[in-house]
Design a protein with these regions (language model features):
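Acidic-and-aromatic substrate-binding clefts and catalytic sites of carbohydrate-active enzymes
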Residues: 102-105, 123-133, 155-162, 187-193, ...
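His/Asp/Glu-enriched short active-site or ligand-binding loop at hydrolase and phosphoryl-transfer sites
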Residues: 192-231, 265-274
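C-terminal motif of bacterial Sec signal peptides marking the signal peptidase cleavage site
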Residues: 19-22
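CE4/NodB-like, metal-dependent polysaccharide N-deacetylase domain
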Residues: 114, 119, 145, 154, ...
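Bacterial N-terminal signal peptides that target proteins for export
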Residues: 1-11
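Active-site beta->alpha N-cap acidic-glycine motif
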Residues: 57-155, 174
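Bacterial signal peptide processing site
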Residues: 24-26
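C-terminal domain-boundary segment and adjacent tail
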Residues: 80-90, 129-130, 247-274
Length: 274
């Protein structure tokens, strides 16, 4: 029986369509596989990039994770003067990084704090920070805490109560207006204070006056107020900002972190202990 010409034409069209569909079916997965491979390569690169942020900041190893915070902070007697703290009595192998004034406002330092998860404490002076509070808002958003370092960086010892109270409470009000917080910790400029300072600080809501045992100089060297000339668990380290010469804040922090690692220590959050 002969097939009508029209039927043969329809069969040819159907066969061609099937062949084209088969080719398309084979091509799509290949393209998908190629795309998946590229995505996997990008993911692997990103994983390596984010898994080792410490290398970008000049460290050969990651900082150890700090231990859980203590159940209780340093005791403070209600109604009495706040304690003056140079170092924290703890067996935890932690030291505490504190930064003074607020003169240096390097955006890369914000990146450093975020990527290394550094629980730093920033003691701010209003006249030094000036219009740069936005920088410290960014630092706070990545884990830094904000504390009080007076309005004008005046040496408080010997000043009358009213003057000292104005310096401390005035900065409390500024920080509350800027960040919605009332700092518990206060550092007197230059570390100098007297009984009047403690009374004024208590009246401004301060629960501890924070000094330091170790201080970092502009060249990256450490000096020690008392005790052995090496970092020990519980040490509070002061890192001034805005040094006229020497290393940047980031560079000094890297050197400090290397020394911390050398001593088998890590960085703790001061506010968890004091």
């Amino acid at each position: 029986v002969r097939t009508p010409p029209g039927t043969r034409a329809l069969a040819a069209v159907a066969l061609a369509s099937a062949l084209l569909a088969g080719c398309a079916g084979e091509t799509a997965p290949a393209a998908s596989r190629a795309g998946s491979g590229q995505e996997a390569t990008r993911s692997a690169k990103n994983a390596t990039h984010t898994a080792q942020p410490y290398r970008r900041w000049g460290l050969s190893d990651p900082l150890p994770v700090p231990p859980p915070p203590p159940a209780r902070r340093l005791p403070h007697r209600p109604g009495g003067p706040p304690p003056v703290v140079h170092r924290v009595p703890t067996r935890d192998r932690v030291v505490f990084l504190t930064y003074d004034d607020g003169a240096e406002k390097d955006p890369r330092f914000v990146d450093m704090v975020r990527e290394l998860r550094l629980p730093v404490s920033m003691f701010l002076t209003d006249s030094v920070v000036g219009p740069g509070y936005g920088h410290f808002a960014r630092l706070r958003s990545v884990g830094a805490s904000i504390q009080n370092h007076t309005l004008d960086h005046a040496a408080l010892r010997g000043l009358p109560y009213a003057g000292q109270r104005a310096e401390i409470c005035g900065q409390q009000h500024k920080l509350r207006a800027r960040f919605g917080i009332r700092p518990r910790l206060f550092r007197p400029p230059y570390g100098v204070h007297d009984a009047t300072t403690l009374r004024a600080a208590a009246d401004c809501g301060v629960t501890a006056v924070v000094l330091w045992r170790a201080a970092m100089e502009g060249d990256g060297g450490l000096t020690y107020a008392k005790g052995p000339a090496r970092l020990r668990p519980g040490d509070i380290v002061s890192v001034p900002s805005g040094e006229p010469a020497g290393l940047s804040l980031r560079e000094r922090t890297t050197r400090l972190l290397r020394e911390i690692q050398k001593r088998g220590l890590t960085v703790g959050r001061l506010e968890d202990y004091v």
